[in-house]
A protein has these predicted regions:
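Membrane-interface transmembrane helices that cradle and orient dolichyl/undecaprenyl
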Residues: 15-30, 135-139
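Membrane-interfacial loop-to-transmembrane alpha-helix junctions, especially the N-terminal start
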Residues: 30, 67, 138-150, 196
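Helical-face signature of the major facilitator-like transporter fold
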Residues: 31, 35-39
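Transmembrane-helix signature of polytopic, lipid-linked glycan biosynthesis machinery
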Residues: 149-167
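Hydrophobic/aromatic-rich transmembrane helices and adjacent perimembrane loops
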Residues: 164-191
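Signature aromatic-anchored transmembrane alpha helix within multi-pass, membrane-resident enzymes
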Residues: 188-200
Length: 200
């Protein structure tokens, strides 16, 4: 885990808490707090854009509600200084990620990606998580968001590895929803609880 991952994990956790509150009750302050948490995520690391994207597509009906646009306005206002800096410096970060890092297809990058993810997430958790993912269905909007973020990050960066090297920690934000879902899956399954206590 690199330094930017620490605030990313922290504000990612805050975001999920506030998103839960927002889905349960949409009002002015929940929208403002959600917007602030998204801005703080974006300032932490650009992978946060993916997190928010996967959450949004997991709940497209949310886009019909006015308060989600208030959250978007709050985020946009807080991101103005960052946008101004990029305009003044010819968008160096976007140039680096979208142009400079692009390479020709090399199978070794994809083959590196898979074992690296086992190292990040622990194979004793990742493999059972994938099994449970297919055996269980989400029960509410919050769990649906966890599904989309967990799977979305792993699939997105697997595809990204087809055009360049993917650092192992780029998917670390998915550990938050992944662990929450894993614990949700096993809470009524004694055999899985025994596995966790014994192996994990």
């Amino acid at each position: 885990i690199t330094t930017p991952d620490v605030p990313l994990l922290f504000f990612g956790t805050v975001f999920f808490i506030l998103y839960k509150k927002f889905t349960e009750k949409q009002n002015f302050w929940n929208a403002v707090l959600l917007g602030i948490s998204v801005a703080l995520l974006f300032y932490s690391k650009y992978q946060a854009v993916l997190l928010v994207f996967f959450v949004v597509i997991s709940n497209l009906k949310m886009l019909t509600k006015p308060y989600i646009y208030l959250a978007g306005i709050v985020t946009s206002l807080l991101m103005i200084p960052h946008l101004m800096w990029h305009i003044e410096h010819d968008f160096p970060t976007f140039q680096y990620h979208l142009v400079d890092r692009s390479e020709k297809f090399k199978i070794k990058y994809f083959l590196e990606y898979l074992p690296n993810q086992f190292a990040v997430f622990n194979p004793f958790i990742l493999i059972p998580f994938v099994i449970l993912l297919f055996k269980n269905k989400y029960q509410n909007l919050q769990e649906k968001a966890y599904y989309f973020v967990s799977v979305g990050f792993l699939v997105f960066f697997a595809l990204t590895s087809l055009r360049g090297h993917v650092e192992p920690h780029w998917t670390v934000i998915a550990s938050i929803p992944m662990m929450i879902l894993f614990l949700q899956f096993i809470k009524e399954k004694p055999s899985w609880q025994k596995y966790v206590r014994t192996i994990v």
